Each structure stands twice: as structure tokens, then as C-alpha cells.
A protein has these predicted regions:
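Terminus-proximal functional modules
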Residues: 1-52
Length: 52
């Protein structure tokens, strides 16, 4: 059964593309972007857990 790990990170204005590309280059897939509790954007990512 495939297992996933998740991470959240704030998206800084005017640096969204760089942040998304950085996480994507490490194998993270963007799941969703939402407004955070303090008004900024928060990105949710997932990727398969590596077999140990």
C-alpha cells in the first residue's frame, strides 16, 4: 500500500514560483493552496514515502 508524507509551507508574495519549483524538484506534489489563519497563503504538499 502506498503511503504519503505531507508538509505545509507559507507562500511568500512574489516568490510563489520559486517556492513551488523548489518543493517540486524535491519530489513534492502540490495538493492545495489556502488562506492561512493570519491571512497569508499556505501551500500543502504530499509525496510518496520512500521504502526503507
Amino acid at each position: 500500500m502506498l503511503k504519503w508524507e505531507y508538509i505545509t509551507t507559507p507562500l511568500l508574495l512574489h516568490k510563489e514560483t520559486a517556492i513551488l519549483n523548489n518543493w517540486g524538484s524535491e519530489g513534492w506534489e502540490l495538493v492545495q493552496i489556502v488562506t492561512g489563519p493570519e491571512g497569508g497563503l499556505v501551500a500543502f504538499f504530499k509525496r510518496p514515502v520512500q521504502a526503507s
